[in-house]
């Protein structure tokens, strides 16, 4: 019989904004956002919950955010501050278990299956972790507890902020039935729209499709869909998780017709990229990359060997790549290559 696992997913609440709020308590009762300080061309990185009540959201253009909330306070990002808080939180995770898989500065998976303390209760362990984080940093996070990574991550988002949601093995079947397929790991807009054309919007709908049908429509990803729809996820929490790259990209509603228009998108992309990187990522950078997709859906990219993440170096790549374009730009992606340099044509996307 397979041993049931006990997985916790911790996701810090509005992390950048909460760190700023802790550093400056006068912000606590005011709507504010981090990033996007250029009112005309900026993009919001994150915001506090008061700002969200006005409809402000992450990745929203600052101009739109200011329309929704004219009194919105805009703060520059301070990654040194966020990394310092993240390091404290990471140490707390490791004080409970060695099986920690960091995903970014503000979230991680923990496998507490073999933790004997707290009566071997994942729920009690999650509560203790949340309390320890608050005691040492004054910050709150939300936790999801479940038999696997898929469900733990979904659960951590249910009772935000400062929430805890538990899915026991006995509750898995009933929980997934009404779960929207868009919540499943790996299901993006394209897959979601494709499933919608097949009259699939919930996991119960997805369960009606055979494995053969899913493999035919989605290739190898069909295996994942078949399992995820049933609340099955055999991915391990990998404490030595090796990533070959970290990258971000954005598709723009209005085509970027000039070089300046492309360069104006760099600050928000750069902030988004750095927010996804951990201290370990910074230590293992071996290259940087820029990718474009134009209005004809032609994809081009440039890579350079590099030891550090340098905004000016990425800017020069954008300029060089743009000069090779014949059509307006629809998508821009930037990223870093991690590990050993295999060749000059490093593929991140």
Curated annotation (Swiss-Prot):
<keyword id="KW-0515">Mutator protein</keyword>
<dbReference type="GO" id="GO:0003684">
    <property type="term" value="F:damaged DNA binding"/>
</dbReference>
<dbReference type="Pfam" id="PF00817">
    <property type="entry name" value="IMS"/>
</dbReference>
<keyword id="KW-0234">DNA repair</keyword>
<dbReference type="GO" id="GO:0042276">
    <property type="term" value="P:error-prone translesion synthesis"/>
</dbReference>
<dbReference type="InterPro" id="IPR053848">
    <property type="entry name" value="IMS_HHH_1"/>
</dbReference>
<dbReference type="InterPro" id="IPR043128">
    <property type="entry name" value="Rev_trsase/Diguanyl_cyclase"/>
</dbReference>
<keyword id="KW-0808">Transferase</keyword>
<dbReference type="InterPro" id="IPR017961">
    <property type="entry name" value="DNA_pol_Y-fam_little_finger"/>
</dbReference>
<comment type="subunit">
    <text>Monomer.</text>
</comment>
<dbReference type="GO" id="GO:0000287">
    <property type="term" value="F:magnesium ion binding"/>
</dbReference>
<dbReference type="Pfam" id="PF11799">
    <property type="entry name" value="IMS_C"/>
</dbReference>
<dbReference type="GO" id="GO:0009432">
    <property type="term" value="P:SOS response"/>
</dbReference>
<dbReference type="InterPro" id="IPR050116">
    <property type="entry name" value="DNA_polymerase-Y"/>
</dbReference>
<keyword id="KW-0963">Cytoplasm</keyword>
<keyword id="KW-0227">DNA damage</keyword>
<feature type="site" description="Substrate discrimination">
    <location>
        <position position="16"/>
    </location>
</feature>
<feature type="binding site">
    <location>
        <position position="11"/>
    </location>
    <ligand>
        <name>Mg(2+)</name>
    </ligand>
</feature>
<dbReference type="Pfam" id="PF21999">
    <property type="entry name" value="IMS_HHH_1"/>
</dbReference>
<keyword id="KW-0548">Nucleotidyltransferase</keyword>
<keyword id="KW-0460">Magnesium</keyword>
<feature type="binding site">
    <location>
        <position position="106"/>
    </location>
    <ligand>
        <name>Mg(2+)</name>
    </ligand>
</feature>
<keyword id="KW-0235">DNA replication</keyword>
<feature type="active site">
    <location>
        <position position="107"/>
    </location>
</feature>
<dbReference type="InterPro" id="IPR001126">
    <property type="entry name" value="UmuC"/>
</dbReference>
<dbReference type="GO" id="GO:0003887">
    <property type="term" value="F:DNA-directed DNA polymerase activity"/>
</dbReference>
<keyword id="KW-0239">DNA-directed DNA polymerase</keyword>
<protein>
    <recommendedName>
        <fullName>DNA polymerase IV</fullName>
        <ecNumber>2.7.7.7</ecNumber>
    </recommendedName>
</protein>
<dbReference type="GO" id="GO:0006261">
    <property type="term" value="P:DNA-templated DNA replication"/>
</dbReference>
<comment type="similarity">
    <text>Belongs to the DNA polymerase type-Y family.</text>
</comment>
<dbReference type="InterPro" id="IPR022880">
    <property type="entry name" value="DNApol_IV"/>
</dbReference>
<keyword id="KW-0238">DNA-binding</keyword>
<feature type="domain" description="UmuC">
    <location>
        <begin position="7"/>
        <end position="188"/>
    </location>
</feature>
<dbReference type="GO" id="GO:0005829">
    <property type="term" value="C:cytosol"/>
</dbReference>
<keyword id="KW-0479">Metal-binding</keyword>
<comment type="function">
    <text>Poorly processive, error-prone DNA polymerase involved in untargeted mutagenesis. Copies undamaged DNA at stalled replication forks, which arise in vivo from mismatched or misaligned primer ends. These misaligned primers can be extended by PolIV. Exhibits no 3'-5' exonuclease (proofreading) activity. May be involved in translesional synthesis, in conjunction with the beta clamp from PolIII.</text>
</comment>
<dbReference type="InterPro" id="IPR043502">
    <property type="entry name" value="DNA/RNA_pol_sf"/>
</dbReference>
<dbReference type="InterPro" id="IPR036775">
    <property type="entry name" value="DNA_pol_Y-fam_lit_finger_sf"/>
</dbReference>
């Amino acid at each position: 019989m397979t041993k049931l696992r006990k997985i916790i997913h911790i996701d810090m609440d509005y992390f950048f904004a909460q760190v700023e709020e802790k550093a400056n308590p006068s912000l606590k009762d005011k709507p504010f956002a981090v990033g996007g300080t250029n009112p005309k061309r900026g993009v919001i990185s994150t915001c506090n919950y008061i700002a969200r009540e006005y409809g402000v959201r992450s990745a929203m253009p600052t101009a739109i955010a200011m329309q929704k909330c004219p009194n919105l306070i805009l703060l520059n990002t301070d990654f040194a501050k966020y990394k310092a808080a993240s390091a404290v939180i990471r140490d707390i995770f490791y004080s409970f278990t060695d099986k920690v898989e960091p995903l970014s500065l503000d979230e991680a998976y923990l496998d507490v299956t073999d933790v004997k303390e707290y009566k071997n209760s994942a729920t009690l362990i999650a509560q203790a972790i949340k309390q320890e984080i608050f005691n040492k940093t004054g910050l709150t996070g939300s936790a999801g507890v479940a038999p696997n990574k898929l469900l733990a991550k979904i659960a951590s988002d249910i009772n935000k902020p400062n929430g805890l949601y538990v899915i026991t093995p006995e509750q898995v079947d009933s929980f997934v039935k009404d779960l929207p397929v868009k919540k499943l790991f790996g299901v993006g807009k394209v897959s979601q729209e494709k499933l919608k054309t097949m009259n699939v919007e919930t996991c119960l709908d997805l369960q009606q499709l055979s494995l053969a049908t899913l493999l035919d429509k989605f290739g190898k990803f069909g295996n994942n869909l078949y399992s995820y729809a049933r609340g099955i996820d055999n991915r391990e929490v990998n404490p030595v998780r090796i990533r070959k790259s970290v990258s971000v990209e954005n598709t723009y509603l209005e085509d970027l017709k000039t070089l300046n228009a492309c360069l104006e998108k760099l600050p928000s992309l750069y902030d988004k990229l750095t927010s996804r990187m951990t201290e370990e990522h910074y230590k293992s950078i071996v290259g940087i990359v820029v990718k474009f997709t134009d209005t004809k859906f032609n994809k081009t990219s440039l890579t350079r060997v590099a030891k550090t993440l340098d905004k000016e170096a990425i800017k020069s790549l954008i300029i060089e790549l743009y000069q090779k374009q014949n059509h307006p730009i629809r998508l821009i992606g930037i990223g870093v290559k991690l590990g050993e340099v295999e060749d000059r044509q490093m593929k991140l996307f």
